[in-house]
Amino acid sequence: MENNNRFMPHIRRTTHIMMFAHRNSFDFHFFNAR
């Protein structure tokens, strides 16, 4: 249980980073397109 609880935050942080990176890439692509 402890391991699972400690592993959950990591997954959430990774998802957040991936989301942020994806959004940054999208904005950059839009900026480049313009």
From Swiss-Prot:
Leader sequence segment: none
One Pfam family matching this protein: SpeFL
Highest taxon listed in the record's lineage: Bacteria
Binding of L-ornithine, residues: 13
GO molecular function: rRNA binding
Motif Ornithine recognition loop in this chain: 10-16
Keyword RNA-binding: yes
One biological process term in Gene Ontology: regulation of translational elongation
Cross-referenced InterPro entries: SpeFL
Gene ablation phenotype (knockout): Replacing its start codon by AAA (Lys) prevents expression of SpeFL and leads to generation of a prematurely truncated speF transcript, and thus prevents expression of downstream SpeF.
Induction trigger: Induced by ornithine, repressed by putrescine. Part of the speFL-speF-potE operon.
Keywords: Leader peptide, RNA-binding, rRNA-binding, Transcription, Transcription regulation, Translation regulation
Tagged with keyword Nucleotidyltransferase: no
Family: Belongs to the speF operon leader peptide family.
Protein purpose: A small protein (arrest peptide) encoded upstream of inducible ornithine carboxylase gene (speF) that controls expression of downstream genes (speF and potE) by transcriptional and translational attenuation. Its expression controls transcription and translation of downstream SpeF; translation pausing at low Arg levels on this mRNA prevents premature Rho-dependent transcription termination of speF and also enhances SprF translation by preventing sequestration of its ribosome-binding site.
Subunit note: Binds ornithine in stalled 70S ribosomes, blocking the upper two-thirds of the exit tunnel. Contacts 23S rRNA and ribosomal proteins L4 and L22.
Protein name: Leader peptide SpeFL
Species of the source: Salmonella typhimurium (strain SL1344)
Taxonomic classification: Bacteria, Pseudomonadati, Pseudomonadota, Gammaproteobacteria, Enterobacterales
Gene for this chain: speFL
